[in-house]
């Protein structure tokens, strides 16, 4: 929930709105659109000249749209996706296209009841430790669609598992913060 709120502020809110609209349009053909999005994202963001062409405010939008339509035909992309990207260009939001696609994938996972999990540990974990952490998460929240592992020595030990509104803080640093909070409330009456 918190990550959703943070994501929706500023340009993130714009990206969210466009992604939501795309998801609403392609709900029945989401799998094929996902593959097309990966292709479009690679084609439009990998090459610096292509990015510069679409980001250049002097280049007429009609020229940009013509290039997109030609790309759509040559790559056999769906009219829906080509139309979506053309609307993004017409609205002057091409710089947010990659964010829109990222939001789309997050929203699609939510619609399917899936979630992305990030596990943070103080040092790299063994396969057995990872399996144990995942079993804790699975027992309470279900199977994560993706798992990202991060190492942060500042947590001192244990782990922190995050996914949208879910946070399991079993880190030593988290326990120390909780101990400090309880101690203050006992000593200070706060």
Swiss-Prot record:
GO molecular function: proton-transporting ATP synthase activity, rotational mechanism
Signal sequence interval, chain numbering: none
Membrane topology term: Peripheral membrane protein
Gene3D superfamilies per the UniProt record, alphabetical: N-terminal domain of the delta subunit of the F1F0-ATP synthase
Keywords, sorted A to Z: ATP synthesis, Cell inner membrane, Cell membrane, CF(1), Hydrogen ion transport, Ion transport, Membrane, Transport
Keyword Nuclease: no
Keyword Transport: yes
Record InterPro entries: ATP_synth_OSCP/delta_N_sf (IPR026015), ATPase_OSCP/dsu (IPR000711)
Superkingdom assignment: Bacteria
GO cellular component: plasma membrane; proton-transporting ATP synthase complex
Record localization: Cell inner membrane
Primary subcellular site in the record, as a coarse category: membrane
Biological function: F(1)F(0) ATP synthase produces ATP from ADP in the presence of a proton or sodium gradient. F-type ATPases consist of two structural domains, F(1) containing the extramembraneous catalytic core and F(0) containing the membrane proton channel, linked together by a central stalk and a peripheral stalk. During catalysis, ATP synthesis in the catalytic domain of F(1) is coupled via a rotary mechanism of the central stalk subunits to proton translocation.
Similarity field: Belongs to the ATPase delta chain family.
HAMAP family, sorted: ATP_synth_delta_bact
Subunit relationships: F-type ATPases have 2 components, F(1) - the catalytic core - and F(0) - the membrane proton channel. F(1) has five subunits: alpha(3), beta(3), gamma(1), delta(1), epsilon(1). F(0) has three main subunits: a(1), b(2) and c(10-14). The alpha and beta chains form an alternating ring which encloses part of the gamma chain. F(1) is attached to F(0) by a central stalk formed by the gamma and epsilon chains, while a peripheral stalk is formed by the delta and b chains.
PANTHER family for this protein: ATP SYNTHASE DELTA CHAIN
Protein name: ATP synthase subunit delta
